[in-house]
């Protein structure tokens, strides 16, 4: 009996379920009516497991015994109620093994609804004829959201064997979807895998369009011979993609649906078969890699061959040789060995036209009357940056020059007798130094104007200067346009000074500060005035300076002075000192040679006048060199400029070669240079080497 | 609670700005109280879609909560209540027809009003349910979160339905309900079977009513799109 009771727990419960009254409400109580729960089962959620355990333990002996003693007795019970579309539902029962209840009509299905007015059990409206033991509730008898209770009742015995309560929406098991089909999405590149898209349609009985039913679908697939279905995630739409199927394998796919959130899945649809045959590999990767390897090797071999065969050329292309210094159009051999005459000739433009194409003579007979406009142009930055030493610059233009005319007082603010036209007194000293160097060489090249700090914005650029070197521009060149062609690099080779007049005398100064120039000397005696550092202050003193300068210019035609500007010293030689120094007598070169700080006594008054101007510029130490003209050789008349002949041991420049009796006190002269001949002004490297620093 | 709601809606509005621009304005559109006005104009169809989304989500979450609660607290024999006469959910003030045909004949106005009544009737019980669940010792976090989420979404659903009614029926008489923290009517100890069953009943009834709301709204939508076929069955 124990086994019997244990083996049929459900029936036992149902047998005791007789006290249920359909009308009574369900009142929560420890022992709900109609449901017999043993005390120890009430609070034990796992009592089912104990049931099963006992079953297992007892099943074998008890079962067989019970079978022997009692053939399987099963009470009539309701097997279930289901709705397909939430509009109708059916209930099925089983009569069990009770012998006396197997005849039809012995058992009835009775039901009632919560909202019934009569509160009585009603007979099943429709016992279906086709299916045995089925009760069908049609649309008219079906309501939703209202509790139904269905019971299996035997009238004759007045006994209810089973009861089932539910609401319509809880028993919906939708029909299977229809029209399940699949399409191939893609095949992997290796040809081993592919993806498909399975699509279907909702069951026709489900009224999805109206929204009466909202379905969720579940797709399952498996390999043909496997027993385990792979379940995919629930899908709300009517298609699902399946990834990772293997070619050559046969698959089965099926789908079923449930009402959303109720999880009572309906029956499965028909199974469809998916199969994609294997695709033979059109190409295997092995030859491709082989080809690639061979190709790479071949290319490498080719490259090597090219390199080895064209080695020389490649070396030239990759590592171009450093070009030797040369001047365009001039044979480097000329530069080496001191063939200066020829070089000068060439450079003067009379030679090849590749050189600077200035018209060879310009200024010789052109009266120079012009007004200089002093503009505060900034010198070009490129030219400002040149910071090479002044001595080198000047030495580059030194001894071989006759400083005819090429030296304009570039920024020589005062004592500018004989300064060329368009001379700008505002130029900074460095620039003037540069310009002077350039002018010495008298090349129509550019010169880096700044020897030192050239950042005086107030000082006009070199543009204003128009150096009437051969080949220079016309006098009417605007000052700022004059630019750099006036300023010439010291690299510009030596220029023949002979018979060139590069300078013009300032014949007059207008009250407004313009300078009136007159043509310079025929003989290329460069006229120069001792220069000094000049700055704004110098310009401010403008008017009287101008007059002074002009006067000085007029008078001092001879002398070039070498000014070594020391910070403490004014760094300039005045007109008087220049005058003093400018003796045309070459025999007394010593007097010409001045180095600062010791200025001459006569020059002092002038110096003092200019001292404040010059001391302001004391921060740069660039020696301010005025080439001194070797007077006697060239210039019967006054010459204001001197070529720097040499540098003595004190870093002072020798403007005139010392006379033989004075030679011991002077630095050795460059041996290769004949003094009477005005050097062209090009210092060859070997000559320079002879100069002691 | 209102402030939180408003804040949440503002945050969502900011985050979903591009969506909002394309889809319209979120449901939280309280014009009458001078609170945050996020509505500019939204078409009826989009609003209805939004409301249906809400109803569907609420229904799904309520079903999940019911299942969770059942598994955790309800003894096995009482699950699904197959064999019981059933519990009685709180009766509503109006009878709701049961059959599909009857329901399909309900007018738009009636559908919307019944949805609104359903929503409004469940706001307070859900809040009560939250407090009760908090007293359970081992209530899973997900359950608590779900019930909290549902009660919040119910409020926004209510607002949406109010706006929908105003738009579709030109009925301006409705006001949204204001939640007030009420005293819990039952002060029973938690985890006693009675309270467990009561809560279980509550959840099940709410699940049913959520299903009702969803169905009504979907029927309404069907009528908006294709009036003829919706009345056919």
Swiss-Prot record, chain B:
In which tissues or organs does this protein occur? Pituitary gland.
> Span of the secretion signal?
1-24
A Pfam family the protein falls into: Hormone_1
Give GO terms for biological process.
animal organ development; growth hormone receptor signaling pathway; positive regulation of growth; positive regulation of receptor signaling pathway via JAK-STAT; response to nutrient levels
> Where does it mainly reside?
secreted
For this protein, the record's InterPro entries field holds: 4_helix_cytokine-like_core (IPR009079), Somatotropin/Prolactin (IPR001400), Somatotropin_CS (IPR018116)
Q: Where in the cell is it found?
A: Secreted
> What are the recorded GO MF terms, alphabetically?
growth hormone activity; growth hormone receptor binding
Query: Which cellular component, as a GO term, is one annotated location?
Result: extracellular space
The disulfide bonds in this chain are 29-39, 89-205, 222-230
Is Aminoacyl-tRNA synthetase a UniProt keyword of this protein?
no
Q: Out of the domains of life, which is the source?
A: Eukaryota
Alphabetic keyword roster: Disulfide bond, Hormone, Secreted, Signal
Question: What family name appears in the similarity comment?
Answer: Belongs to the somatotropin/prolactin family.
Role: May be associated with ion regulation and reproduction.
Q: What is this protein called?
A: Somatolactin
Q: Supply the source organism for this entry.
A: Oncorhynchus keta
């Amino acid at each position: 009996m124990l086994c019997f009771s244990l083996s049929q727990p459900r029936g036992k419960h149902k047998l005791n379920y007789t006290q249920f009254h359909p009308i009574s409400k369900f009142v929560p109580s420890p022992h709900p009516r109609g449901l017999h729960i043993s005390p120890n089962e009430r609070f034990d959620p796992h009592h089912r497991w104990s049931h099963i355990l006992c079953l297992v333990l007892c099943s074998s002996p008890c079962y067989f015994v019970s079978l022997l003693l009692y053939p399987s007795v099963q009470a009539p019970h309701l097997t279930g109620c289901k709705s397909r579309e939430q509009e109708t539902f059916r209930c099925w029962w089983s009569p069990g093994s009770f012998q006396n209840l197997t005849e039809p009509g012995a058992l009835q299905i009775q039901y009632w609804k919560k909202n019934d007015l009569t509160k009585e059990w009603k007979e099943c409206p429709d016992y279906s004829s086709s299916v045995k033991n089925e009760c069908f509730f049609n649309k008219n008898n079906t309501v939703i959201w209202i509790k139904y209770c269905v019971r299996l009742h035997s009238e004759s015995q007045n006994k209810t064997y089973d009861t089932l309560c539910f609401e319509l929406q809880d028993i919906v098991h939708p029909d299977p979807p229809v029209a399940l089909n699949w399409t191939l999405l893609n095949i992997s590149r290796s040809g081993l895998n592919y993806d498909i898209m399975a699509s279907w349609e909702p069951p026709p009985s489900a009224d999805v369009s109206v929204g009466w039913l909202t379905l969720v679908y579940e797709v399952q697939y498996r390999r043909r011979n496997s027993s385990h279905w792979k379940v995919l995630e629930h899908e709300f739409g009517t298609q699902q993609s399946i990834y990772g199927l293997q070619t050559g394998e046969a698959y089965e796919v099926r789908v079923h649906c449930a009402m959303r959130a109720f999880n009572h899945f309906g029956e499965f649809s028909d199974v469809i078969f998916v199969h994609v045959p294997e695709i033979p590999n059109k190409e295997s990767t092995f030859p491709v890699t082989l080809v690639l390897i061979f190709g790479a090797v071949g290319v490498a071999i080719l490259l090597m061959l090219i390199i080895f065969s064209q080695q020389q050329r490649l070396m030239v292309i990759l590592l171009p040789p450093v070009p030797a210094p040369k001047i365009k159009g001039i044979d480097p051999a000329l530069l080496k060995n001191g063939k200066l005459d020829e070089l000068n000739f060439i450079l003067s433009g009379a030679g090849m036209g590749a050189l600077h194409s200035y018209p060879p003579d310009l200024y010789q007979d052109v009266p120079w009357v012009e007004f200089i406009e002093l503009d505060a142009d900034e010198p070009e930055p490129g030219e400002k940056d040149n910071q090479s030493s002044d001595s080198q610059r000047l030495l580059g233009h030194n001894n071989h020059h006759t400083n005819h005319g090429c030296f304009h007082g570039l920024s020589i603010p005062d004592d500018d007798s004989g300064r060329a036209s368009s001379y700008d007194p505002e130029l900074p000293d460095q620039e003037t130094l540069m310009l002077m160097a350039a002018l010495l060489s008298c090349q129509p090249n550019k010169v880096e104007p700044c020897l030192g700090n050239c950042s005086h914005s107030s000082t006009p650029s070199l543009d204003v200067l128009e150096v009437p070197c051969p080949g220079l521009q016309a006098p009417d060149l605007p000052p700022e346009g004059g630019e750099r062609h006036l300023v010439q690099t010291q690299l510009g080779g030596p220029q023949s000074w002979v018979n060139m007049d590069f300078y013009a005398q300032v014949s007059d100064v207008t009250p407004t500060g313009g300078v009136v120039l007159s043509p310079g000397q025929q003989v290329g005696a460069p006229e120069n005035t001792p220069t000094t550092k000049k700055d704004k202050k110098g310009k401010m003193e403008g008017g009287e300076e101008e007059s002074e300068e002009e006067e000085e210019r007029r008078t001092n035609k001879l002398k070039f002075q070498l000014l070594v500007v020391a910070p403490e010293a004014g760094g300039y030689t005045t007109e008087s000192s220049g005058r003093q120094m400018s003796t045309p007598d070459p025999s007394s070169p010593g007097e010409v040679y001045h180095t600062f700080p010791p200025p001459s006594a006569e020059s002092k008054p002038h110096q003092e006048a200019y001292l404040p101007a010059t001391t302001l510029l004391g921060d740069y130490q660039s020696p301010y060199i005025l080439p001194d003209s070797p007077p006697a050789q060239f210039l019967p008349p006054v010459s204001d400029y001197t070529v720097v002949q040499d540098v003595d041991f004190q870093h002072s420049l020798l403007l005139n070669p010392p006379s033989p009796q004075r030679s011991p006190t002077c630095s050795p002269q460059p041996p290769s240079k004949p003094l009477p001949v005005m050097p062209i002004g090009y210092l060859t490297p070997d000559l320079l080497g002879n100069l002691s620093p | 609670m209102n402030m939180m709601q408003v804040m949440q809606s503002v945050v969502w509005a900011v985050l979903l700005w591009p969506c909002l621009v394309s889809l319209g304005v979120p449901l939280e559109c309280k014009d009458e109280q001078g609170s945050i006005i996020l509505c500019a104009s939204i078409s009826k169809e989009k609003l209805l879609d939004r409301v249906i989304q809400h109803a569907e989500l609420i229904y799904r979450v309520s079903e999940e909560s019911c299942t969770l609660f059942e598994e955790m607290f309800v003894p096995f024999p009482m699950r699904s209540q197959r064999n019981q006469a059933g519990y009685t959910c709180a009766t509503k003030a109006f009878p709701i027809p049961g059959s599909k045909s009857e329901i399909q004949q309900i007018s738009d106005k009636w559908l919307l009003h019944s949805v609104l009544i359903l929503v409004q009737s469940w706001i307070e019980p859900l809040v009560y349910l939250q407090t009760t669940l908090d007293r359970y010792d081992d209530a899973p976090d997900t359950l608590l979160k779900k019930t909290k989420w549902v009660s919040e979404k119910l409020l926004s659903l209510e607002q949406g339905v109010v706006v929908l009614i105003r738009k579709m029926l030109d009925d301006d008489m409705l006001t949204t309900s204001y939640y007030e923290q009420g005293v819990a009517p039952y002060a029973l100890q938690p985890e006693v079977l009675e309270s467990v069953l009561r809560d279980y009943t509550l959840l099940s009834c709410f699940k049913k009513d959520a299903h009702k709301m969803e169905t009504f709204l979907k029927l309404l939508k069907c009528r908006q799109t294709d009036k003829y076929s919706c009345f056919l069955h």
